[in-house]
């Protein structure tokens, strides 16, 4: 008799996606981050829903409503810090997931890759708006600085900024609309994730060797469900350790001070996961140039499939490309570090050098290294 999971229309959908899904037998722990991102999304929506029940999106009451959640609501403190640190874990998983895609050549699955980039941009927008909601000093000034970047757009810039603000400065209307978008975007992310999976299952998963694995596939369940559950437990261990022992570690102390438009913090900076892009923005003295560089630092991912000149999909057997890949990873860590430092010598120079290296590695060095490796293959 045929199992119900193969007959029932709804269960059949789940079955084809998570149970009987043919999966390459050799995918490593780097393939765990997709399911971890799904877990992060569920965690963020759940905790966010409970926070929204007690939050007040108004400039006069937002900060005190956060204090009320933390002090008076049953387990409000853990819900709040799980949501804040859950966002950090979300981005760690996201960066590692993208890093794996770059290393093993998953970007050649164009539809999946492009939807992934849209997902990244949507997640970044959601996180930015969420950071504004507690209405602390860094929330207010972060929102002011980042939304002000729109004024770099010629002719319509100033009008656009005032339109986004809902007035002549960041105030209650800005907070209300940011809360609205912060609430709706995770559901849009969920829909995009479904599309991401749909396109992925059209081609099947990539594998570390970067070769077709049709002749050697196994069912997703029980092999990879067990592997994913192990990954989930390790993820929860790190998240709970962070949340229970050092909840404010990744945040900014300035955000525990109520927003004050008359007092600018000495060093305005976004959350740690945006610092690499923030450094690239600051490295260019021209405002419009900085904004374009900021956008390109993310949108450059769309060019990766075009810049792929190697005859091999994966970097597993390409030592030169591996060297440049880890150079790029180190460069991103340097950019992140510089973003958290004040705008003074030597940090400005280091930031500019790291920014140039970031674009040079992706646009010039990696394609050249791939061509050299192709030649080396011919010599052997």
UniProtKB/Swiss-Prot annotation:
<feature type="binding site" description="axial binding residue">
    <location>
        <position position="97"/>
    </location>
    <ligand>
        <name>heme b b566</name>
    </ligand>
</feature>
<dbReference type="GO" id="GO:0006122">
    <property type="term" value="P:mitochondrial electron transport, ubiquinol to cytochrome c"/>
</dbReference>
<keyword id="KW-0999">Mitochondrion inner membrane</keyword>
<protein>
    <recommendedName>
        <fullName>Cytochrome b</fullName>
    </recommendedName>
</protein>
<dbReference type="GO" id="GO:0016020">
    <property type="term" value="C:membrane"/>
</dbReference>
<keyword id="KW-1133">Transmembrane helix</keyword>
<dbReference type="Pfam" id="PF00033">
    <property type="entry name" value="Cytochrome_B"/>
</dbReference>
<dbReference type="GO" id="GO:0008121">
    <property type="term" value="F:ubiquinol-cytochrome-c reductase activity"/>
</dbReference>
<feature type="transmembrane region" description="Helical">
    <location>
        <begin position="113"/>
        <end position="133"/>
    </location>
</feature>
<keyword id="KW-0830">Ubiquinone</keyword>
<feature type="binding site" description="axial binding residue">
    <location>
        <position position="182"/>
    </location>
    <ligand>
        <name>heme b b562</name>
    </ligand>
</feature>
<keyword id="KW-0813">Transport</keyword>
<feature type="transmembrane region" description="Helical">
    <location>
        <begin position="33"/>
        <end position="53"/>
    </location>
</feature>
<keyword id="KW-0812">Transmembrane</keyword>
<keyword id="KW-0408">Iron</keyword>
<dbReference type="InterPro" id="IPR005797">
    <property type="entry name" value="Cyt_b/b6_N"/>
</dbReference>
<comment type="similarity">
    <text>Belongs to the cytochrome b family.</text>
</comment>
<dbReference type="GO" id="GO:0046872">
    <property type="term" value="F:metal ion binding"/>
</dbReference>
<keyword id="KW-0479">Metal-binding</keyword>
<feature type="transmembrane region" description="Helical">
    <location>
        <begin position="288"/>
        <end position="308"/>
    </location>
</feature>
<keyword id="KW-0249">Electron transport</keyword>
<feature type="transmembrane region" description="Helical">
    <location>
        <begin position="178"/>
        <end position="198"/>
    </location>
</feature>
<comment type="subunit">
    <text>The cytochrome bc1 complex contains 11 subunits: 3 respiratory subunits (MT-CYB, CYC1 and UQCRFS1), 2 core proteins (UQCRC1 and UQCRC2) and 6 low-molecular weight proteins (UQCRH/QCR6, UQCRB/QCR7, UQCRQ/QCR8, UQCR10/QCR9, UQCR11/QCR10 and a cleavage product of UQCRFS1). This cytochrome bc1 complex then forms a dimer.</text>
</comment>
<dbReference type="GO" id="GO:0005743">
    <property type="term" value="C:mitochondrial inner membrane"/>
</dbReference>
<feature type="binding site">
    <location>
        <position position="201"/>
    </location>
    <ligand>
        <name>a ubiquinone</name>
    </ligand>
</feature>
<dbReference type="InterPro" id="IPR016174">
    <property type="entry name" value="Di-haem_cyt_TM"/>
</dbReference>
<comment type="function">
    <text>Component of the ubiquinol-cytochrome c reductase complex (complex III or cytochrome b-c1 complex) that is part of the mitochondrial respiratory chain. The b-c1 complex mediates electron transfer from ubiquinol to cytochrome c. Contributes to the generation of a proton gradient across the mitochondrial membrane that is then used for ATP synthesis.</text>
</comment>
<feature type="transmembrane region" description="Helical">
    <location>
        <begin position="226"/>
        <end position="246"/>
    </location>
</feature>
<feature type="binding site" description="axial binding residue">
    <location>
        <position position="83"/>
    </location>
    <ligand>
        <name>heme b b562</name>
    </ligand>
</feature>
<keyword id="KW-0679">Respiratory chain</keyword>
<dbReference type="Pfam" id="PF00032">
    <property type="entry name" value="Cytochrom_B_C"/>
</dbReference>
<keyword id="KW-0472">Membrane</keyword>
<dbReference type="GO" id="GO:0045275">
    <property type="term" value="C:respiratory chain complex III"/>
</dbReference>
<feature type="transmembrane region" description="Helical">
    <location>
        <begin position="320"/>
        <end position="340"/>
    </location>
</feature>
<dbReference type="InterPro" id="IPR036150">
    <property type="entry name" value="Cyt_b/b6_C_sf"/>
</dbReference>
<dbReference type="InterPro" id="IPR030689">
    <property type="entry name" value="Cytochrome_b"/>
</dbReference>
<feature type="binding site" description="axial binding residue">
    <location>
        <position position="196"/>
    </location>
    <ligand>
        <name>heme b b566</name>
    </ligand>
</feature>
<keyword id="KW-0496">Mitochondrion</keyword>
<feature type="transmembrane region" description="Helical">
    <location>
        <begin position="347"/>
        <end position="367"/>
    </location>
</feature>
<keyword id="KW-0349">Heme</keyword>
<dbReference type="InterPro" id="IPR027387">
    <property type="entry name" value="Cytb/b6-like_sf"/>
</dbReference>
<dbReference type="InterPro" id="IPR048260">
    <property type="entry name" value="Cytochrome_b_C_euk/bac"/>
</dbReference>
